[in-house]
């Protein structure tokens, strides 16, 4: 069953708690547990559902960060997920509810951070989607930068990693050295090792095993393709 069937069909068979559970509960009729600060359930199903609702919520609030939600930002979000046509209205309902205000995004981010390791490839992929939404209408605004920095901090990424993402999406998305976190004078063998490491870190099988839904893995592979193609643009 697709992730959408698990979420909107009410067949997941578990209680989804916390802020994300509250968001899902606005229409799904699930029982919602009071959120506590203990470690959340670690089953893959729970991670997938939390991750998917978290994507919708954070993407909507990302788009709202500068006060204006553009059609480019909505399109960028839709490009990041495989959404069944019959579930599109449900997804839009969560999106529209979350985008009413930028406030509260930290609670969604913290709940996701409890499910995955700090600086994990899954959280990194989510950050990539948020960056792609931010830049989709031409530039990353000051408000969007502040939003992204706060989410990045909650997810456990250091300042160096955040600055790298800013550099990639603002200026050098096609620069192989920036993407591979290398310098032009680095030995080619060293650069190739970094490429292989990044590809292994973001391999679809690895991401799915950690709890990332297939519907996200299959669509949100722009970064992986970018890393793969760097060998074509290196001297």
Residue spans for each PLM region:
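Small-residue-enriched hydrophobic alpha-helices in membranes
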Residues: 1-229
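Conserved small/polar residues in nucleotide/adenosyl-binding loops
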Residues: 230-235
């Amino acid at each position: 069953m697709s992730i959408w069937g698990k979420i909107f069909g009410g067949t997941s068979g578990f209680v989804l708690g916390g802020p994300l559970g509250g968001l899902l509960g606005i229409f799904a009729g699930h029982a919602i547990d009071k959120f506590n600060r203990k470690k959340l359930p670690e089953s893959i199903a729970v991670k997938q559902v939390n991750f998917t609702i978290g994507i919708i919520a954070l993407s909507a609030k990302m788009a709202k960060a500068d006060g204006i939600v553009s059609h480019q930002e909505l399109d960028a979000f839709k490009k990041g997920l495989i959404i069944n046509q019959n579930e599109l209205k449900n997804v839009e309902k969560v999106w529209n509810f979350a985008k009413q205000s930028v406030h509260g995004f930290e609670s969604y981010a913290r709940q996701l951070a409890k499910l995955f390791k700090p600086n994990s490839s899954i959280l990194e992929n989510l950050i990539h989607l948020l960056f792609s939404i931010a830049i989709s209408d031409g530039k990353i605004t000051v408000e969007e930068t502040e939003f992204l920095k706060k989410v990045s901090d909650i997810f456990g990424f250091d300042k160096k990693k955040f600055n790298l993402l800013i550099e990639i999406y603002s200026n050098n998305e096609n620069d192989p050295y920036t993407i591979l976190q290398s310098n032009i004078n680095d030995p080619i063998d060293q650069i190739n090792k970094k490429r292989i490491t990044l590809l292994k870190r973001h391999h679809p099988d690895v991401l799915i095993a950690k709890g990332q839904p297939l519907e996200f893995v299959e669509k949100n592979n722009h970064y992986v393709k970018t890393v793969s193609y760097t060998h074509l643009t290196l001297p």
